[in-house]
Design a protein with these regions (language model features):
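Eukaryotic gene-expression regulator signature that favors modular helical reader/repeat domains
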Residues: 1-177
Length: 177
């Protein structure tokens, strides 16, 4: 499938993504393979448009642990904002997939107080789902108690039919049984 830049003249090339989610033709992103450019300004790549987000998702997986740490340190204060961004949330999912326990704990602590709101958000829900899949069962159980109490205060029966929240609830159920 070919992803086109957004209507405002994307600064990124049109890139061809294969079904596995990675960039098919590495030449399509040759000018953006400068690691220093990516490491120095990851937010530019993440927030501009779909192509920028796809570029950083693909390249992040190829970086060294030190380079990944540099990017993480530049964006960690924006985790909440990026998790709800229509393009950047996909990178936050990749970040969680590629992270060690320390980074996952940081992301968890950044999002845990707003878990319910993120679970209802059409972009944030992907981040919460991936995060729940990475957390230890003990943390999931503690989080479930807080989440459940919050749900009961927010008309849980009505909100449980929300498609995004429902996906999060399914992960909770799988993880705590």
């Amino acid at each position: 499938m070919n992803y086109q830049g957004s209507q405002y003249n994307s600064p990124f090339p049109n890139i061809n993504i294969i079904d596995g989610g990675s960039i098919q033709n590495e030449d399509d992103i040759k000018e953006f393979q400068n690691k220093e450019e990516l490491i120095n300004n990851p937010l530019y790549f993440l927030q501009k448009d779909e192509n920028g987000s796809k570029i950083i998702q693909d390249l992040y997986k190829k970086l060294t642990p030190n380079e990944k740490n540099q990017i993480f340190n530049k964006i960690k204060s924006k985790i909440k904002e990026l998790s709800k961004n229509e393009f950047a949330n996909y990178f936050i999912v990749v970040l969680i997939e590629e992270s060690d326990k320390e980074k996952i704990d940081f992301i968890y602590n950044a999002l845990k107080d707003d878990l319910f709101e993120f679970s209802l958000d059409k972009h944030g829900t992907y981040v919460i789902q991936e995060l729940l899949n990475k957390l230890d069962k003990k943390i999931i159980e503690e989080l479930w108690d807080k989440f459940y109490n919050h749900c009961n205060n927010q008309n849980f029966e009505e909100k449980a039919f929300d498609q995004n929240l429902n996906h999060v609830l399914q992960i909770f159920i799988k993880k705590i049984k």
